[in-house]
A protein has these predicted regions:
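N-proximal helix/coil linker or "cap" segments that precede and/or mark the start of modular domains
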Residues: 5-6, 10-34
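Short, small/polar residue-rich loop motifs at catalytic or cofactor-binding pockets
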Residues: 29, 53, 132-134
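A short beta-strand-turn-helix
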Residues: 33-53
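Short, internal strand/loop/helix patches
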Residues: 35, 89, 102-135
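Short active-site neighborhood of thiol/selenol oxidoreductases, capturing the structured segment around
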Residues: 47-68, 74
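Structural microenvironment flanking redox-active thiols in thiol-disulfide oxidoreductases
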Residues: 68-106, 118-120
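Thiol-/selenol-based redox modules, centered on thioredoxin-like
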Residues: 133-170
Length: 170
């Protein structure tokens, strides 16, 4: 009986594309991966994160309640993040068109990466379930990971990041 249940569980996870890659950890380099943003422009994530601060946050689906709160949290704290020189990329498995509509609807001031093939998720070790990225956030300084939020908050995303950065200056 246990064998049958185990076999069924593995089969279901395989069919629905659940994956659990090894995640980026504090001290890791920014993964070398390129992905199109909401305009179709290719973004070299490692190049963008080589100097200064880069926040890369993953969310399951554009224009859904939790993901909207997360993006708007960062938008609403954009001035504070900007003073600290934080660049931001939001990443989901949505299409470029969906990312563009999400960005425009909520006036998000940062790029949204359309990771349709899940290459960015794989490079960062972010798991996907049923094709959706797990909510996770990474902060890099000069090409190295300095902070990971494995469950990444929604409405408090910006305040959590800002609190971490403030703790680093004390």
């Amino acid at each position: 009986m246990r064998f049958t249940l185990s076999l069924m569980t593995c089969s279901l996870l395989s069919c629905f594309g659940a994956s659990s890659p090894e995640p980026v950890q504090v001290g890791s380099a920014v993964p070398a991966v390129t992905c199109n943003d909401q305009t179709g422009q290719a973004v070299d994530v490692a190049k963008e994160g080589a100097k200064g601060l880069l926040l890369v946050y993953f969310y399951p689906k554009a224009d859904t309640p939790g993901c909207t709160k997360q993006g708007c949290s960062l938008r609403d704290s954009w001035a504070e993040l900007g003073k600290l020189g934080v660049k931001v990329f939001g990443v989901s498995t949505d299409s470029e068109a969906d990312q563009k509509a999400f960005k425009e609807k909520y006036k998000l001031p940062f790029a949204l990466l359309a990771d349709k093939n899940k290459e960015v998720c794989k490079a960062f070790g972010v798991s996907t379930t049923l094709g959706y990225a797990s909510r996770t956030a990474f902060l890099f300084r000069d090409g190295k990971c300095i902070w990971v939020d494995p469950k990444s908050s929604t409405s408090d995303q910006a305040s959590v990041v800002l609190s971490f950065l403030e703790s680093q200056t004390k």
